[in-house]
Amino acid sequence: MSANVQEAANAAIEPASFVKVPMPEPPSSLQQLINDWQLIKHREGGYFKETDRSPYTMEVEKPVNGGSGNTEMVTRNQSTLIYYLLTPDSPIGKFHKNINRIIHILQRGKGQYVLVYPDGQVKSFKVGFDYKNGEVSQWVVPGGVFKASFLLPNEEFDNGFLISEVVVPGFDFEDHTFLKGEDELKHLVGPEKAAELAFLA
């Protein structure tokens, strides 16, 4: 088990059939979970629900848009917590990044993460409880690193993948950026690697 993604075993990127062609709806057991927990569709893919937002706030330094190197002080909640679920009908979390670090904790199922660092380094690792084969169940993604995820087949959770995410300082969409399609991906990792990762862009 590793909270440091750099220590996690590198995994080949081999999406399952339902990742390439999503199913029309989730299995009944996962649909029941979505209904019971009142999860909603996430704009990056998958389903989510915010379960806690700290009532306490803090002043943090945030880069000003435009890459000028300037910063501004903004107010953020001290932390936020969500459930995040991938299912066979919504099996991909598209590339995005946050200014702040995000802590991830596996709850059920299996998935795979792909990280793209500002220097173009790519790291991919599997998430699960099979530690002997290099899977991880908790990990931290640094701020400024693009991350994407996709579902891996598993019987124990009906091909679902459920995690918790903690953001410190708390999540705010002003701190969140989506990858700008394949062109930005090519700029970061080159055309050959971008072609391999295009399904996550």
From Swiss-Prot:
Coiled coil: none annotated. It comes from the Eukaryota. Pfam families: Cupin_5. One of its GO terms (biological process) is pyrimidine-containing compound metabolic process. GO terms for cellular component: cytoplasm; nucleus. Transmembrane segments: none annotated. This is Uncharacterized protein YML079W.
